[in-house]
């Protein structure tokens, strides 16, 4: 515990906030190119084959892993996608989501509810 005199000499420093999606460089979304599209398994209590893509962000070329939400997708290597921040809790290292229905990523087929999240037009 510092004395009042020590606090007068040098006040307390507030901790810097940690950026949860540093690859976006404070942008809401970024364009990226798929390098590899594959499936991976989630952490311990869950079991599935989650679809993810390793993407290279346009402009400065850092590579991150992005989750492909929804059932079925048309992404392959060299697909141009739009990524946003947002982690997937049961996939370690996945801190970005691919936005469905933007650029090369098609919206989810036969989606009736929560359409805006999966890039589906009103039918």
UniProtKB/Swiss-Prot annotation:
Pfam families membership: Ribosom_S12_S23 (PF00164)
UniProt entry keywords in alphabetical sequence: Methylation, Ribonucleoprotein, Ribosomal protein, RNA-binding, rRNA-binding, tRNA-binding
Entry GO CC: small ribosomal subunit
Residues modified to 3-methylthioaspartic acid: 90
CDD domains in the cross-refs: Ribosomal_S12 (cd03368)
Record PROSITE patterns: RIBOSOMAL_S12
GO BP annotations listed: translation
HAMAP family: Ribosomal_uS12_B
Gene3D superfamilies linked: Nucleic acid-binding proteins
Quaternary structure, from the entry: Part of the 30S ribosomal subunit. Contacts proteins S8 and S17. May interact with IF1 in the 30S initiation complex.
InterPro entries noted in UniProt: NA-bd_OB-fold, Ribosomal_uS12, Ribosomal_uS12_bac
MF (Gene Ontology): rRNA binding; structural constituent of ribosome; tRNA binding
Protein's name in the database: Small ribosomal subunit protein uS12
Its job: With S4 and S5 plays an important role in translational accuracy.
Record's keyword annotation contains 4Fe-4S: no
SUPFAM superfamilies per the UniProt record, alphabetical: Nucleic acid-binding proteins
UniProt family annotation: Belongs to the universal ribosomal protein uS12 family.
This protein's encoding gene: rpsL
NCBIfam families, A to Z: rpsL_bact
């Amino acid at each position: 515990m510092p004395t009042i005199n020590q606090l007068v000499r040098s006040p307390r420093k507030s901790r810097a906030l940690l950026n949860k999606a540093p690859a976006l460089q404070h942008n809401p979304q970024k364009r990226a190119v798929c390098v590899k599209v594959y499936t991976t398994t989630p952490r311990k209590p869950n079991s599935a084959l989650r679809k993810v893509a390793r993407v290279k962000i346009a402009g400065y070329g850092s590579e991150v892993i992005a989750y492909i939400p929804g059932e079925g997708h048309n992404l392959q290597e060299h697909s141009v996608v739009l990524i946003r921040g947002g982690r997937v809790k049961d996939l370690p290292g996945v801190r970005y989501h691919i936005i469905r229905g933007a650029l090369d990523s098609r919206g989810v087929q036969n989606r009736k509810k929560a359409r805006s999240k999966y890039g589906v037009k009103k039918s």
